[in-house]
């Protein structure tokens, strides 16, 4: 394993942990508390990491990074932020892990199928589809029948994730040149 693989794996774990923490906090400005949480801003970085790993190493190594991120995220979420007496906390842990794993593995597969197209098609398509799957899996598993406005939160969350995914094309493109120069 080289340093880039370790760095991407570590960053994936950080993104998962940060997002799991930040999703608990609705944005309380401009009436957005019913629509949006802070987790929507950090989570799309996971797709950037997955797509960079996929472009650099291929889908098998990208999957390993997804599994490492999943293990870190679920382990730390269960250890530090899950109150097992509180059903919603357990549902968030299960929803987060399920949504992350399904969406990221889907992202890896879609990216791999589109990798020979123009540079932006694979990351934007895989991130868009992965974000959509992640959002609706997470919110439905975590908050269905709780009284929390999970449908409106999920649409607000998805809108931000798509916006951030578009912005993530900039670092993706810039880092492609760096990764090619390093030739991992």
Model-derived features: where do they sit?
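Hydrophobic transmembrane alpha-helices
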Residues: 1-55, 60
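Cytoplasmic-side transmembrane-helix entry/capping segments in multi-pass membrane proteins
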Residues: 5-9, 61-71, 118-125
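Membrane-interface helix termini and inter-helical loops of multi-pass transporters
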Residues: 24-33, 83-88, 147-153
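Helix-adjacent hinge/juxtasegments
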Residues: 72-100
């Amino acid at each position: 394993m080289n340093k880039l693989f370790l760095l991407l794996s570590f960053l994936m774990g950080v993104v998962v942990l940060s997002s799991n923490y930040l999703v608990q906090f609705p944005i309380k400005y401009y009436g957005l508390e019913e629509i949006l949480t802070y987790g929507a801003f950090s989570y799309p970085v996971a797709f950037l990491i997955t797509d960079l790993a996929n472009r650099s190493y291929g889908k098998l190594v990208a999957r390993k990074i997804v599994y490492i991120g999943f293990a870190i995220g679920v382990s730390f979420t269960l250890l530090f932020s899950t109150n097992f007496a509180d059903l919603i906390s357990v549902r968030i842990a299960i929803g987060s892990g399920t949504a992350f794993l399904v969406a990221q593995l889907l992202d890896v597969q879609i990216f791999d199928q589109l990798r020979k197209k123009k540079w932006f098609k694979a990351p934007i398509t895989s991130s868009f589809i992965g974000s959509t799957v992640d959002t609706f899996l997470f919110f439905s598993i975590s908050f269905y029948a709780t009284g929390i406005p999970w449908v409106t939160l999920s649409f607000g969350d998805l809108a931000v994730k798509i916006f951030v995914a578009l912005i993530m094309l900039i670092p993706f493109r810039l880092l492609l040149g760096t990764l090619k120069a390093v030739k991992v």
